[in-house]
Amino acid sequence: MLEQQRNPAEALIVSVLNSQSQVTNKPLRESVKQALKNYFAQLDGEDATDLYELVLSEVEHPMLDMVMQYTRGNQTRAALMLGVNRGTLRKKLKKYGMS
């Protein structure tokens, strides 16, 4: 019998290839943390600007792309899945050139 997941976010697992060429699964949040650590390390003491927008767009664009594929372009279904109204979805699709 399959166990039910307690938190839907637990389903957001990223497969990562580690240094020994082994695939490991880790939560999306851990991948975001690691990406930010790498980003900060590359700043070399410089200040970051628009970090929130940078991270949001890196996650939002592929999420919208996959949801639109899953719903076969049905914006009403996609908006329901995402928990946003259809007008908001349309604005986001336009922002990323997906309309």
Curated annotation (Swiss-Prot):
Report the GO molecular function annotations.
DNA-binding transcription factor activity; sequence-specific DNA binding
Please give the InterPro entries that the UniProt record associates with this protein: Fis_DNA-bd (IPR005412), Homeodomain-like_sf (IPR009057), HTH_Fis (IPR002197), Trans_regulatory_Fis (IPR050207)
Q: Which Pfam families match?
A: HTH_8 (PF02954)
Which terms are listed as keywords in the entry?
Activator, DNA-binding, Transcription, Transcription regulation
Listed under subunit, the entry gives: Homodimer.
Q: Report the sequence similarity comment from the record.
A: Belongs to the transcriptional regulatory Fis family.
Per its UniProt record, what HAMAP family does this chain match?
DNA_binding_Fis
Question: By what name is this protein known?
Answer: DNA-binding protein Fis
Species of the source: Actinobacillus succinogenes (strain ATCC 55618 / DSM 22257 / CCUG 43843 / 130Z)
The gene is: fis
